[in-house]
Structures are given as structure tokens and as C-alpha cells.
Curated annotation (Swiss-Prot):
GO molecular function term, any single one: zinc ion binding
Domain of life: Bacteria
Summary of the function given for this chain in its UniProt record: Single strand-specific metallo-endoribonuclease involved in late-stage 70S ribosome quality control and in maturation of the 3' terminus of the 16S rRNA.
Enzyme class: hydrolase
GO CC annotations on file: cytoplasm
Family to which this protein belongs: Belongs to the endoribonuclease YbeY family.
Official protein name in the record: Endoribonuclease YbeY
Binding site for Zn(2+): H119, H123, H129
Subcellular location: Cytoplasm
Cofactor: how bound: Binds 1 zinc ion.
Length: 159
């Protein structure tokens, strides 16, 4: 399985060094864990509060910025065999929210960013924690397992 990654850093912070190789590894580990075998592509945009707030309001009706927004690809299934890689969609990650949450949750910014990558990628694959308690438990369990493979602690465990 090959992953094509498009990374746009519209917002950068000295408190979070983003390394393309680490980002790619987190996404590839997620895809491998849920047994995605096809070549895939994903877009990631790192944004500020203002962009996140605007997108969250426009697409989810929520009047605030948020840590990660997931926009799954809407390419029709019948077109996919014609493509070199399956477009999974795009993630929009609000770096200031990730940094604030990391402090609140007593985590490193890097660990929380990786969690948001895994979480968002699972959303792109159709997992949803807002539909039912069972779905939330399944998604959290997957996140814990994937993050462990990346050498990161359970993000839901109290620090």
C-alpha cells in the first residue's frame, strides 16, 4: 500500500514541529491497522482558529474552531478503478486548538497532533463516534491500538 500525502501548512507554530515522515507513518499505520490494502491519497491542511471556525460553522453548523475536521472523498465508486490511488479525503487540523488541548490534557503537542491524525483518518474511512455509544467505543479502541503501535499512550486515560 502506497500513500500519497498532500500537506499544506497555512499555520505553523514553534511549539509543534511537523515532520512529513511522522505524519505519513501515523496515517499508514492507521490504514494498515484497519486493513486498507489499496494505494491511497489524503490531503492535510494545518490551519489557524479563524479558518477552522469558518469551516466548522459552514459544514457542521458549529460556531467555534475545532481540533480536526474530516472531509471524506465523494468520488463515485465506479470511478475508483480508473484512479492510481483511492482518494480518502481531506483533514483540516487547527494547530492552536491542538496546542491548547494538549496543555489541558497534559500531553505533548506531538502526541495530541498524532492522535488527531489517527482520529481524522478513521473518520475519512467511515468511522463515527457521534452515531452511537457502540460506535464511539469501537473508534476509541481503534485509536488506542493504533497509537500504541506508534509508541503513544492511551489518549483517553486520565493523566
Amino acid at each position: 500500500m502506497k500513500l500519497n500525502l498532500s500537506l499544506q501548512q497555512a499555520f505553523k507554530s514553534p511549539d509543534l514541529a511537523l515532520k512529513r515522515a511522522h505524519i505519513k507513518k501515523a496515517i499508514e499505520t492507521t490504514l494498515d491497522h484497519v486493513e486498507v490494502k489499496t494505494d491511497s491519497e489524503i490531503g492535510i491542511a494545518c490551519v489557524d482558529h479563524e479558518q477552522s471556525h469558518r469551516l466548522n460553522l459552514e459544514y457542521r453548523g458549529k460556531d467555534k474552531s475545532t481540533n480536526v475536521l474530516s472531509f471524506p472523498s465523494d468520488i463515485p465508486e465506479e470511478v475508483l478503478p480508473l484512479l492510481d490511488a483511492r482518494p480518502l479525503g481531506d483533514l483540516v487540523i487547527c494547530i492552536p486548538v491542538v496546542l491548547d488541548e494538549a496543555i489541558e490534557q497534559h500531553k505533548t503537542a506531538q502526541a495530541h497532533f498524532m492522535h488527531m491524525l489517527v482520529h481524522g483518518t478513521l473518520h475519512l474511512l467511515g468511522y463515527d463516534h457521534e452515531t452511537s455509544d457502540e460506535d464511539a467505543e469501537e473508534m476509541e479502541a481503534l485509536e488506542i491500538e493504533i497509537l500504541a503501535k506508534l509508541g503513544l499512550e492511551n489518549p483517553y486515560q486520565e493523566q
